[in-house]
């Protein structure tokens, strides 16, 4: 029997896995498996860097497959006209999907004492529940359930029935704490979630970060920063002071993988145009953003897109006057005086509001335009 395994789909997931391992007593570290799914993220050589830290016993790739990889599943998604027939279709889909995914699962999860899964809405959630493997779920992104309750949105209309069929009978699968074999789901802030699942339990990310030693931070940076010299060069640019002793306000723009590439380019051109009047612009692409910002904005300092933004918290003296984003939750940032999350109302100008106003469509209202001042 092995100790524990983390199933990660993004760099942020892996970052939280590092935080959780570093929170353990030193003698218990180095005994976990880090499983990196390539379904929605290309980890490049991150696995090698993560393994080199010695924090994990093994780091393995996971060739997880989306449902459209299996053409035979499409017939189960056809609307049959009423909830009874549609639910029967969904039951068959759930069982079949788990069986089709099985050959691509590289480990025997039953050999692990603890299984931790980020984003169990992905195929791994179907596989674990249909194979009766108990696991701990973790939120996909910081406070992601505050901004988008995916379980309720994806299952709007008779949600209570669908949650029952999943959590009690395991006939279908509903993510984010409603799976029968999901033991619990770890979130950053339960109080901010308007309709929490009974299985949610709170573990603030700040609590994990605040306990890090400098040695711990160095381990994280070793894994997540592939070009330390390049990163330090950007930080030096940010800290530059003019000859008269004055500093130009520094503004960091965090991108998001929004819309189509052409619309996304317009969005961030508009954001840059708005904020470049206030100071010097720096850009940090999202790890899953495929737009080449170095070509769109060749004159602006650019941080490595594969690096989680949280890495910048570990450099003392680094300070931005403003950090701006569209949808990324900024509450984990400590290196800025003002944090601006533009939100849904901003996005209404660029796409049909029905596309991104998911919470509103299920009766959850949130503050659209969020500005936080750090003291």
Where are these regions (language model features)?
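Active-site and donor-binding regions of nucleotide-sugar-utilizing enzymes
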Residues: 7-177, 314, 326-332
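Leloir-type glycosyltransferase catalytic cores
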Residues: 355-375
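Catalytic donor nucleotide-activated moiety binding site of glycosyltransferases and closely related
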Residues: 255, 276-306
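A donor-sugar binding/catalytic signature common to diverse glycosyltransferases
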Residues: 310-355
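Short, charged/polar "capping" segments at the starts of alpha-helices
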Residues: 39-47, 124-125, 145-146, 260-262, ...
């Amino acid at each position: 029997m092995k100790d524990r395994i983390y199933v990660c789909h993004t760099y942020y997931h892996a970052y939280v896995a590092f935080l959780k391992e570093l929170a353990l007593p030193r003698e218990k570290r180095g005994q976990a498996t880090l499983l990196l799914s390539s379904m929605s993220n290309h980890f490049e050589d991150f696995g090698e860097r993560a393994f080199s830290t010695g924090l994990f016993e093994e780091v393995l790739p996971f060739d997880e497959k989306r449902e459209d990889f299996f053409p035979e599943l499409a017939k189960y998604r056809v609307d049959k006209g009423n909830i009874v027939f549609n639910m029967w279709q969904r039951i068959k889909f759930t069982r079949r999907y788990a069986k089709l995914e099985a050959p691509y699962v590289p480990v025997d999860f039953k050999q692990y004492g603890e299984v931790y899964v980020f984003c169990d809405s992905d195929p791994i959630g179907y596989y674990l529940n249909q194979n009766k493997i108990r696991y701990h779920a973790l939120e996909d992104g910081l406070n992601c359930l505050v901004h988008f309750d995916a379980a309720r949105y994806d299952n709007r209309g008779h949600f209570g029935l669908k949650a029952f069929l999943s959590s009690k009978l395991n006939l279908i699968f509903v993510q984010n704490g409603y799976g029968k074999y999901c033991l619990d789901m770890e979130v950053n802030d339960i109080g901010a979630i308007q309709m929490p699942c009974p299985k949610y339990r709170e573990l603030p990310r700040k609590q994990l970060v605040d306990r890090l030693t400098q040695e711990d931070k160095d381990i994280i940076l070793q894994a997540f920063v592939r070009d330390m010299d390049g990163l330090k060069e950007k930080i030096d640019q940010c800290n530059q002071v003019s000859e008269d002793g004055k500093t130009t306000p520094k503004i960091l723009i965090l991108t998001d993988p929004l819309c189509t590439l052409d619309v996304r380019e317009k969005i961030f051109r508009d954001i840059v145009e708005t904020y470049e009047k206030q100071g010097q612009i720096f850009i940090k692409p999202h790890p899953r953003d495929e737009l080449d910002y170095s070509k769109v904005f060749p004159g602006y300092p650019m941080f490595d897109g594969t690096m989680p933004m949280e890495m910048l918290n570990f450099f003392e003296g680094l300070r931005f006057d403003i950090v701006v984003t569209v949808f990324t939750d900024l509450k984990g940032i400590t290196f800025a005086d003002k944090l601006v999350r533009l939100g849904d109302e901003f996005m209404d100008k660029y796409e049909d509001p029905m596309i991104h106003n998911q919470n509103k469509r299920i009766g959850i209202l949130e503050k659209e335009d969020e500005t936080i001042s750090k003291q």
